[in-house]
Amino acid sequence: MANNFLEVNNVDFKAGGKTKVKNVSFSVQNEGDIICLLGPSGIGKTTILRTIAGLEKINNGSIIINNKTISSKKIHIEPEDRNISLAFQDNSLFPHYNVEKNILIGTEKKNKKKIKINAKEIVEFLNLKKILNKYPHEISAGEAQRSSLARALVSNPDLLLLDEPLSNVDQSFKEEIQVELKQLLSKSKITTIIVTHDSYEAFYLGSKCGII
């Protein structure tokens, strides 16, 4: 266990007096692995991602990355200090910013030269160049999903968390984006955890899958 890239150990999380996650444990063995967590809606998959990202403080257990505890009952490293990116299910693009500014949000304190290089490569790979000056209401659901992925990847995080990344994409675009996403994750070699209720998606995208 000590050599695992990520360890989630017996994690409990409560909110509003209710238990949202209880005694959850899993691990990611190697950097670059793509892990899919498969389970029905409402079971706590998103909450697990939020605890890993540091958006929620756990009540019991621990979360460890590269042998460093980032969450426990007594320890809570803030989200901005974790180098973890979380792409939400609803894209969460800011409506008053264009696509380019949405992609670069949160990179202000990063190395500008590296961010510029990363952004250029990701934008080209995801075919976003033509919509950089457009606003979220002017683009398709598929383009919005690609923009959200670009934002999550541009800072080159240690860990990428994807919450139902294709759930809001029209079925006619879904297969195309699945292929693009798999290629992008393989190319980036960023350790990734994807939560989904779609078994085909889980086994297509993931190098390993777990059922919650």
Which residues does each PLM region occupy?
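Conserved ABC ATPase "signature" region
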Residues: 114-131, 183
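Catalytic Walker B motif of ABC-type/P-loop ATPase nucleotide-binding domains
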Residues: 160-164
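Conserved ABC ATPase signature
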Residues: 135-139, 143-145
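The feature captures the beta-strand-to-loop junction immediately N-terminal to the Walker
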Residues: 38-40
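A short, proline-enriched helix->beta-strand linker immediately N-terminal to the Walker B motif
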Residues: 154-158
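ABC ATPase NBD coupling module
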Residues: 70-86, 109
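Short coil-to-helix segment of the ABC ATPase nucleotide-binding domain corresponding to the Q-loop/switch region
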Residues: 97-106
